[in-house]
Amino acid sequence: MKGWGLTVMKGAAPERFEVEVLGVLPNTLGRSRILVKVSGLGLERTGVIAGMSGSPVYLDGKLAGAVSATWAFGKDPVGQVTPIENMLESVSGGAPFSIPRARATSSSAAAWEALAAAHGLPPDERVAALERIAAPYRPAAGREAASLLAPVSAGIPSATLSRFAEDLGRLGLPAPFLASAVGAAGAGRAPETRAAPDKLVAGGALTAFLLDGDLQLGATGTVTRVDPDGSFVAFGHPFLGMGEIELPVATTDVVEVFASSMLSFKLAAPHAPAYRLTSDRDPGVSGRMDRVAPMIPVRFRLEAAGGPAKDLRWGVAPAPSIFPLLLAMSTDVALLLNDPTPAQKTVALRLSIGTAAGPFVYEDVLSGPRARDIAILTTIALGGLVADNEFEDPKISGVEITLANALGERRFRVVDAGVSARKVAPGQTLTASVRLAGRRGEEETRVVTLRVPREAPEGRATLVIADGAATSAARLSLDPAPPRSLAGLRRMVERLLPANRLVATLLVPARGATTGGATLTALPPSAAAILSDGEGADPGRSAVSSRFLAEDILTLDRPVAGSIRIEVEIERPRS
């Protein structure tokens, strides 16, 4: 049996190619594919082309299905066609055989504890810990790539594509094709957005976006069918396999077809997004032409030593399972654009994710050869913690990230400290001088000042002078109640101090315990014992032995490490 199909080879107009049916490939779960040989439009030389996914095939004058697969390094232009009956399941919400991505996500409390614990580790250990935390928020191994989509990439440097090659491949966007698809404007700039597109048509090129703005990332396939009500089906296979979804799509021009012995592909130039995908299932994708799907706005503020600040903006797909990865890729691009030499730098990172519970704000200052790795992995871990939280839909409204670079590795170490007096009365001020040593031995002195509360109890107290990470760990140990809501999780994140904070804390002994998501201090001995380890104690309860009395925080121009404890006595004046 012979028929014909439609696809775009250059420009925007679909062209006819010839189809010969070779047979039917039986498949599992009631799905079969039609095996075809194509010809015309130069397909004898190129073979079936990446970007032809969804190209409609007509047999006996009727729509039979869409080109959806081929084999690499084939000598004949042979491909597979997904029957249109299966594709229409994606419109109805059927497709009962769609297999969800396997993701071993942990509870939000466990993920938070792991992130907080990693915050104070040495750089190499911190990277290893963050990689473990980030793993559930990355595409799972073993997912079959959608091999006949043509990747679209603009503004993304090749170094970023290489770093995330494995992740992108699992999304069906192989990095070698992405590197070839980088916009002609070059890394760091996206092509100019052109005029509003015409309507989608069967056989026309279609691009679905994951990133759009100063950066572009997406995939180009072909529209299979458009109905009078504005609904359409495309691709003939899944894009990301995510079921119900909202992604922006646009009509697309084909600039050229790149012939390759492995797999030829289309070089595409998409128009501005105007429509939306609404379903992404095994037999294909579907959508509507009623409006454009919104994206999560991301704004980067780049500050480099000796240069003007720069702002970059783009949208990120609002799908929780890929949002963390796309945010991490965006951060990597911004770091490269701010300073393309990653070794021996100091990076100040501020990340704010707007949610229904308020903004999640995280700050840190990183220095040394692992600074870039830590910044990227922290972004994916925090993005996953928010987007994939177990409490409620975060309704992420936007992301703002500030990156400030300084040349060279810069850090302080706490060497020594001394107090103005070993005894202090309630209501008085306790002063301490802190000696700091730089990376090459240079020394500086800082002074911290704490006012002892008038209601402070008499007796022994401990002055702890420490870096931000150590202080964060101490705060969590003194108030270890796990988060029980999205708002509680946000407050926990805000308690993590950046590495460039030098903190003086005055602690006094206390009896307390955590219970029901709260930490109780100054308890009677019997109550503290019952709540911490008494009969029927639950795993969320733990004992608390100290409480904060006063605190002073200094912001330094570089990270600081180390801690010192000084015992003092709180004593009221005797009349």
Q: Model-predicted segments: where are they?
A:
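Terminal presequence/propeptide segments associated with secretion/organelle targeting
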Residues: 1-575
